[in-house]
Amino acid sequence: MEAALLVCQYTIQSLIQLTRDDPGFFNVEILEFPFYPACNVCTADVNATINFDVGGKKHKLNLDFGLLTPHTKAVYQPRGAFGGSENATNLFLLELLGAGELALTMRSKKLPINITTGEEQQVSLESVDVYFQDVFGTMWCHHAEMQNPVYLIPETVPYIKWDNCNSTNITAVVRAQGLDVTLPLSLPTSAQDSNFSVKTEMLGNEIDIECIMEDGEISQVLPGDNKFNITCSGYESHVPSGGILTSTSPVATPIPGTGYAYSLRLTPRPVSRFLGNNSILYVFYSGNGPKASGGDYCIQSNIVFSDEIPASQDMPTNTTDITYVGDNATYSVPMVTSEDANSPNVTVTAFWAWPNNTETDFKCKWTLTSGTPSGCENISGAFASNRTFDITVSGLGTAPKTLIITRTATNATTTTHKVIFSKAPESTTTSPTLNTTGFAAPNTTTGLPSSTHVPTNLTAPASTGPTVSTADVTSPTPAGTTSGASPVTPSPSPRDNGTESKAPDMTSPTSAVTTPTPNATSPTPAVTTPTPNATSPTLGKTSPTSAVTTPTPNATSPTPAVTTPTPNATIPTLGKTSPTSAVTTPTPNATSPTVGETSPQANTTNHTLGGTSSTPVVTSPPKNATSAVTTGQHNITSSSTSSMSLRPSSISETLSPSTSDNSTSHMPLLTSAHPTGGENITQVTPASTSTHHVSTSSPAPRPGTTSQASGPGNSSTSTKPGEVNVTKGTPPKNATSPQAPSGQKTAVPTVTSTGGKANSTTGGKHTTGHGARTSTEPTTDYGGDSTTPRTRYNATTYLPPSTSSKLRPRWTFTSPPVTTAQATVPVPPTSQPRFSNLSMLVLQWASLAVLTLLLLLVMADCAFRRNLSTSHTYTTPPYDDAETYV
């Protein structure tokens, strides 16, 4: 123990002052010891030295408390006492108080050291030294000096008991040296007519603790809480002792025979465990007023010491989330508040949260003069020129890992950092990514130009499935061609799984829409993997691209004669004079093609929000116009029930026993003034008040079928079944995420400086930073919560009627176009799908006939059974539906 004084790396000084009488024990509170957070095996080896003066001679008593385990035990006795009397270990206690605080308690009426005869009156306590060695081997020391020497006079304390004290059935509980009890009492006068004074005494096991009110009394008791401070004998705790007197009776309603009711709460400290569980709390109080003569009253309560572990013993911690790209990540630890450029003694430690081996997991420790510590794996660090300390971690894998970092300066001021490192998943998206300034990086694989519009809140998502690029809409891109996938940096929060991709400004038509689609004669294989999530909507852009399709998982009826392996429904080709027969009808379920299941999909999930898919799927090129409008649908969750319809359906459900999810939406109106041309096509939505309509025949959505992301494992952010989500007015340029309802708080992923592409979150919430913004438009949502159900209409569109959902929609083709206040560019007329319409009508009436026949059979069966039941003779009432007998 003598050598311990030489290895103290950090020392805390304190001055101890004893107040009033000696209660029979000395208590020294020791603050700011480092109990590391997120570490169940972080122990501390604690020793103490008690320095006495015996007739001018120094005497040391060394105590060994062993290893402290703050998560399992709160009270410790010395394992050994060196230089003390035989029973010295029974005279000391070390107790954890919570928040990194300790309390060392020693009996004062018994001597812990051996003395000679005649020295009994000459033993004084001078100081106390506590040595705290943490799991990193750092020695923390606390030196507590007595302001005045405290003489230990051994004596026998007689047993004290107060008579004429009313007993209560309330127990006073002591936790971490703090007593807390609430007692009912009565006073002869009401509030405002009474004063109040109180004192307490705790007796037991040769300990006598007295506490008195600091100001003597409350001169006037007021309605409500009357707070006061109290002072207890012995050591004054850094946590003040006090009490609260509260009137519980109405002002003019005394309790017969007792007076007015009050509630008294007392919280004295420190209360030593040396009292024992057989000790008693005595409360003496008085209340005198001008209208009644008062007197002294006494109530008593038993005291019990709790073995409950106190509130968190861990040091306060700052939490930071870091999402990084690549193989390593760096975190900079700033100087502590009391540190300057000349501080000579700085220590930085780091360990992974919840380690299981104290022999190998606590090797990462750096000082200003030390080099790279041995045994520190996956973590490296160095002091920078500005005194910050940069910690670099590597080889962490894909799962998030938590690193606990502490930094301590010369005066033992310590800050703790909890850093959660999360590696961004590998991206397969073709969308541009963000750099550290928030600008979209250009597409580097296809060489397509990126938009000149600078987004301020866009982040390329992590996607495990194929997507299609929308960086250039001047010419269709074969679906097998993907844009360069760059590392992405979304925070791995469940709120960030909405698909976001870069789309150019497409408010004007492209220059290549008059040329035939290169691959219009045959479906182009998009990818070799089926896309399970084919219900992602497209948002609000109004420019066409060449021969593209929108995923339509909600097929209206199965058709055996599918002429192409395309699993998605085709959009009508505009400007033709004859029906297009490329694909007669979409498959019932877009998640698994029923025809040509082994063939590659010709159109993968369209993840372009505000753009269009670039995969041509039309089987024959149109003559006059080569554009099939797919992106003016304004975030329609599911397609219409006919591949040639240009009018909104009047009925939201069909007879098809489809297992798809979103079967209640409809297509917006297209208008046309061009007789043959198809250039300058703009979709508009008719002005109409939207309401919610949910189909009763559509099954509940299966997991993963309405996701915005194309790969498995991405949480769904698309609209719910039966929902039409249409943007109002002109959509914002380069919108890359679904729209949120008005008033919904928008959570926006942000960009951090980690690796130039980190996206930080804190506590599972999004944080806003550089490159983030919040939409001010009432019907837009840049981000959103993927876990929040969105069942709404948030723009103008034709609504599905609330009539029967078992009828086929009425198809109209010759009605004049309905326009809105928006500027519209006409759309060329289309031919009527007579043969397709006729077959649908036949199927409709056939289905109705089958349903009618089934209904008649059920009615006949019910009548037959009822006739049979009435032919029997009952000796007791039959308990039929008409009457019940009791």
UniProtKB/Swiss-Prot annotation:
Residues 442-488, 596-637, 704-720, 733-760, 773-806 have a biased composition (Polar residues). It is a single-pass membrane protein. It is found in: Virion membrane; Host membrane. Pfam families: Herpes_gp350_A (PF05109), Herpes_gp350_B (PF20676), Herpes_gp350_C (PF20677), HV_Gp350_C-term (PF20678). Residues 861-886 are intravirion. Gene3D superfamilies: 2.60.40.2800, 2.60.40.2810, 2.60.40.2820. Extensively glycosylated. Residues 423-810 are annotated as: Disordered. GO terms for cellular component: host cell membrane; membrane; virion membrane. InterPro entries: GP350_C_dom_herpes, GP350_C_dom_herpes_sf, GP350_N_A_dom_herpes, GP350_N_A_dom_herpes_sf, GP350_N_B_dom_herpes. Glycans are attached at residues 47, 87, 114, 166, 169, 195, 229, 277, 318, 328, 345, 356, 378, 386, 411, 435, 443, 457, 497, 519, 533, 554, 568, 589, 603, 606, 624, 635, 662, 680, 714, 725, 734, 759, 794, 837. The chain crosses the membrane at residues 840-860. Residues 1-839 are virion surface. Keywords: Glycoprotein, Host membrane, Host-virus interaction, Late protein, Membrane, Transmembrane, Transmembrane helix, Virion. Primary surface antigen capable of inducing and reacting with virus-neutralizing antibodies. Almost all EBV candidate vaccines are based on gp350 proteins. Residues 428-437, 507-595, 638-660, 684-699, 761-771 have a biased composition (Low complexity). Initiates virion attachment to host B-lymphocyte cell, leading to virus entry. Acts by binding to host CR2 at the surface of B-lymphocytes, facilitating the binding of viral glycoprotein gp42 to HLA class II molecules. Attachment triggers virion-host membrane fusion and invasion of the host cell. Belongs to the Epstein-Barr GP350 family. Interacts with host CR2. This is Envelope glycoprotein GP350.
